[in-house]
Amino acid sequence: MTQTNFRSGPDVNGLFGSFGGRYVAETLMPLVLDLNREYEAAKADPEFAKEMAYFQRDYVGRPNPLYFAERLTEFCDGAKIYFKREELNHTGAHKINNCIGQVLLAKRMGKKRLIAETGAGMHGVATATVAARFGLPCVIYMGATDIERQQANVFRMKLLGAEIVPVTSGTGTLKDAMNEALRDWVTNVDDTFYLIGTVAGPHPYPAMVRDFQAIIGKETKEQMQEKEGRLPDSLIACVGGGSNAMGLFHPFLDDASVEIIGVEAGGHGVDTDKHAASLNGGVPGVLHGNRTYLLQDGDGQITDAHSISAGLDYPGIGPEHAFLHEVKRVEYVSITDDEALDAFHQCCLLEGIIPALETAHALAEAMKRATNLRDDHLMVVCLSGRGDKDMQTVMNHMAAAEKTQEKLV
């Protein structure tokens, strides 16, 4: 790792090294170029920044705390563990940070309709929330499989006035929902704004979503200075598409003393075909408008991803993560379904916080590492979302485990 400036990307073509870019239909190219121009103009506009700050403070509820997880720290008997509490945001996850930014951009561009894809439903809820706040019609594409396992979030979206379109193609998960949203966008380019929920898609989306989420890392930096008088030693976040992770990581990328770890969904194990670990089990390819690491078969076809967590169940990863993996600035590991569930239960019992199953992957890795570290090592875990949405999944898993145990006795 010889490079010292890891925060300069993307270049004018939307590339982070060899990853990213704009791989879109000809009909969409003028739209993404226009979006890029509008975003660059908004970034330079003090009024846009002022409006963002207002909604982040008074609507989202920022800044959220950097919380010392005292009992988890005692349990691990090693590193001092802090939680960046994104689950305390309005709507219960980090997703709203990005949605506020993009809806303000949509309004600035005069768009009259919002569309979005969602997996776990949290981005769908956040999109439906901002659509209601700004009086815009909203269509959410969601895989039929995810609709089944995320009924509570589906109902929340409907309460907020969104139209839910079930996607039955493929495995009926996030990849398929994104495919359908892109088809809608191509058909309705003039009046529709596609509010992508992660650091993927054609340029400028990966950079734009990262920038809107970077408030996570900026606050963490300030709060850690206030609490400990120095930078953290390590950062840990779960990675699906990777927006919560990029939001935490990006402000620290050029701080060489800070170790950064992204945690992919290992499913049943990366040595099986039931996982969603694109960096640990994939190869470079093109999907959803950008070049990145993808789960593919020998013929280059996208394979199905698996995770107990609907929000990590995606066969790709944001292109900036792919770049950071290749230049070895960030270490990417994987955590299995079972390890995530164990960490989920430990967090509930030790800290009185019910985390999302996505977040539980990061917690599992944090607990593994903390045990082997000195007590002056400062570790920050991004608590990306709360676990209300995962109650049924956890209940089903516990019931299945009990049945298996009964058979063994």
From Swiss-Prot:
CDD domains: Trp-synth_B (cd06446). It comes from the Bacteria. Keywords: Amino-acid biosynthesis, Aromatic amino acid biosynthesis, Lyase, Pyridoxal phosphate, Tryptophan biosynthesis. Pathway: Amino-acid biosynthesis; L-tryptophan biosynthesis; L-tryptophan from chorismate: step 5/5. It catalyses: (1S,2R)-1-C-(indol-3-yl)glycerol 3-phosphate + L-serine = D-glyceraldehyde 3-phosphate + L-tryptophan + H2O. The gene is trpB. Tetramer of two alpha and two beta chains. It is an enzyme of class 4 (lyase). Its cofactor is pyridoxal 5'-phosphate. PROSITE patterns: TRP_SYNTHASE_BETA (PS00168). The beta subunit is responsible for the synthesis of L-tryptophan from indole and L-serine. The keyword Amino-acid biosynthesis applies. Its EC number is 4.2.1.20. Belongs to the TrpB family. GO terms for cellular component: cytoplasm. InterPro entries: Trp_synth_b_CS, Trp_synth_beta, Trp_synth_beta/beta-like, TrpB-like_PALP, TrpB-like_PALP_sf. One of its GO terms (molecular function) is tryptophan synthase activity. This is Tryptophan synthase beta chain. The lineage of its organism: Bacteria, Pseudomonadati, Pseudomonadota, Gammaproteobacteria, Pseudomonadales. It comes from Pseudomonas savastanoi pv. phaseolicola (strain 1448A / Race 6) (Pseudomonas syringae pv. phaseolicola (strain 1448A / Race 6)). The modification N6-(pyridoxal phosphate)lysine is found at K95. Gene3D superfamilies: 3.40.50.1100.
